[in-house]
Every structure is written in C-alpha cells, then in structure tokens.
Amino acid sequence: MTTTFKDASAQEIAQVMEKSWQAFLAYKKFSLKQRADFMRAIATELENIRARVIPVAMEETHLPEGRMNGELSRTIFQLNDYGKAAEEGSWLEARINTAGQDPSKPDLRKMLVPLGPVVVFGASNFPFAYSTAGGDTACAFAAGCPVVVKAHPAHAGTSEIVAEAIVKAAKDTGMPEGIFAHVHGASFETGKALVMHPLTKAVGFTGSLAGGRSLFDMAGQRKEPIPVFAEMGSVNPVFLFPEKLKQDGEAVAKTYAASITQGVGQFCTNPGLIFGVEGEDLQRFLGVLAGELQKVAPANMLHPGIAKAFWQKRAKALEQKDVHTEVAAAGEAEALQGVPTLASATATAFLNNPVLHQEVFGPYSLVIKCKDANEMLQAVLHTEGQLTSTLMATDDDMQKHPELVDAVQNLCGRLVMNGVPTGVEVCLAMQHGGPYPATTDSRFTSVGSDGIKRFARPMCFQNFSNHLLPEELQNANPLGIWRTVNDALTQSAL
C-alpha cells in the first residue's frame, strides 16, 4: 500500500537549509578520499536495501523487476564511479602558474571549489538513477556540497527508503550533520521554498519543460540568482538519409519500433521525430514501422499524471491539421496505459505548426515527410535544441550532405550515427545535455563524472604560502592528482 507523506512546511525547510549550510562549512574541508568513502558507503547501503526497496519501487512506478534491479545497479555504479573520479581529482582542473624568476609576476593557483547546498528534485521516470541517490546527488557530494532532496510524490516511499540508506552511510562515515536531508512536497510551494531559500546555492532537476523552466525563472528572480541545471526532455529527432534508407530501411524501422516503445516510451531520449525524404523507400519504412508498432501491446505508464499527459498531448498532436494517424489503438485504453502511436505529416506542416515540435512523453513518434534534402535542412534549422539527434546514413550520405550534417550537429549534445538514442552510458565521454529547451545549460552533462563540475566554481589563490594552500595546489602535490603547471599537464611535484 502506498504511504502518504506530509509536505514539509516553510519552517521545516528553513531548518533543513540552515543545517545544510552548517554542514557545507565543514564538508568542504573534507578530503577527496573522505568524499569518495562516503559515496562508496551509500553504494553499499543501496545494495543492502535492494530486497526491501525493489518491491516498493515496482508498486509505485509499475516498472518490472528487471528494470528496477538494473536501474538500482546503475545507481550504485554511479556512486562508485563518481566517488572514484572525485578522489582522482582531475575534475578539479587544478592550474598553477608560478612567478618564476620575475618578481613582478604573482604566483597564481586555481581549482574548482564547491558551491554550497544543492537542492535536487527527484525525477518521475527514474526512481533510483535520477532521484534521491541518483546522478545529481552523487555529483554534488563529489563536488563537496551537501544535498537536500525533494522526493518525487509519484514514488515517495521508494525515495524515503533510499534516503534512510544515505543517512546511515553518512553516520557510518562521520559526515557532518545536515550533509543530506530529505523532504516531501506534492505542492508547488514546497519546491518554490527550497529554490528561493537564500542558503540554496544550486538546483538539479530532471523533468518537464514547464517544471524546469519554472524553477529556472524562480532562481533568476532571487536577490542572489543561482544556477539551475535542468534537463527538461527532448524529441530526439532522427534523420533518415537516402542511401541508408534504401539499403537498410526495413531493419532501421524494426530497430526504431523497439526504441520508441522501450519502457512504454518513458525515456527522455525517446525518438519522437523521424525525418525522411518522400518516396517509395520512406513509404516502405513507414509501413514496416507501423506494422511493428501494432505488435506491441499497451502497458501501464509510471503514474496517472504521466498517463493523463500522454493521452492529452497525443490527442492534441493527432488532431492537428495535415497530421495523418498511422498507428493508434482503437477505442479507449485503460486510464493508466500508454499505447504505441505513430503519425506522419509533411515538412510544410512541421514548419508551420509549433505543436508538431512538442514532446509527447510516451510511446509516440511522428514521421516528417520532406520533399528533398533541402527541405529537410529547412526543418532542421527550425527545430529546437535536443539532448540527442541521430543520423541514419552511409558514409556517402554524409559526404553528399555536409551542410545538413552540420546543421543537425548544432541541435544537440549527443550526435548518434546509425544507432538509437535510448540508452545513456555512464562514462566520462557521455554528454547528456543539449541546447535549450533540452536543458538550461548545454555546457554541462548530467551523466558521467564531468557532471561534478556543475556544482563547483573556480577559485584562484594568489601569492599564498605553500602550507596555507589546499593540498590540491601545494608544491609537493601530496594527492598525486593531474595538474596543469606552467601550461604543462603533469602529476609531478613543483
């Protein structure tokens, strides 16, 4: 049975933020190893609660056991991986320029230092990996920041169990009181109070464009504006090039049917737009894709709110002028279910109707029929920023259409060739972020240890005595980290 949690009051939030600030003053002085040990302890506790938390997560999200176990394992991996990166220290971007033999020059040493308390909003579609102990939380801890998590009300019980595991790990590793806090709040006011509190120094968010933009605007209206790192979804356009479509159109269609319906389409990297040039090859692709989608049964979505939004946005998209429905379930599906849906429209309709650009979160995709490559280019130039874009193309296709390839590259943070955008690898080379409205800051990623940098700022120390410097910048390099010394990357001591 789902447990109901009371929204945190303004007074409770104020107390939480004050404790978080006091924890920051202590935690920022903890060593990189201490941070890493804390994160590894959280990972261990998450493994310890696996048997207890998985059934709760399954009940709250309607996600299957295999998916839940896999996501929890990914969350554990993230904590260990980001902890290792924190300890290794290259993310600090330590820079040293010594005065040398010129007494008129200062000794300058720069590194990243933590921002302060970070508020993290749990995501609805990833109860582990993007929520209470997820990537934003792990990155903030690695950067030296305390974390205050606002649980997502759709899986509040899961979040509560995970929060208990973090608190235990904090106690076991001697972390300062207030290093982590967990609050509930289904109301808008709870989130607003957290963002607007003067001791909040950054926000991490994964969710809708409306939600992320609201937090971003609030943060900008503060007396002291703060960064909001919001990942707000994407339609992840796919561009079918002529030779590739002719050679492998049927296989590509089958591959994309699986991608569109994976997890009932509830991934921020779900391919919601597919562009191709009109002709027999595109029609054959469309026919195979439609046939494959019709084989996929409706399934329960994460929670009633997401299901309701899917049906409303789906209906709005399908009722637009010049939109042809290719696949849609007959009659009414159960209220909580998402049904595989495919539509098509001309590029002219896409260019003239902003509704066709909008994300329909769920198992939905829209095929855009272009007259030729030039019209496809025009469509690209009128497409908003994305997390991913995909080129289904041969090498010859790429060489014949360089302007189109360049334009697609400008859209996104991750450019995929001959693959699917669903599936986000946790590694240093991953970029999970893109131009607005995909995210509020395309310079950063929310996946991979480079995401640690979101919650830190550069600090330069000028003419400090060596023993007064942070260990990371001292002459002997006692931590053995990589540093750029007088413009040369090295691990050596000065």
Predicted regions, residues:
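N-terminal Rossmann-like NAD(P)+-binding subdomain of aldehyde/semialdehyde dehydrogenases
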Residues: 1-106
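Short loop-to-beta-strand entry elements in the cores of soluble alpha/beta enzymes
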Residues: 38, 143-158, 179, 224-244, ...
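Rossmann-like NAD(P) dinucleotide-binding subdomain of oxidoreductase/dehydrogenase enzymes
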Residues: 91-258, 275, 279-282, 493-494
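Short, glycine-/Ser/Thr-/acidic-enriched flexible segments
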Residues: 125, 154, 187-189, 200, ...
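NAD(P)-dependent aldehyde/semialdehyde dehydrogenase
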Residues: 254, 276-387
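C-terminal core of ALDH-fold dehydrogenases
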Residues: 333-336, 373-469, 489-492
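Extended hydrophobic packing segments that form well-structured cores
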Residues: 470-494
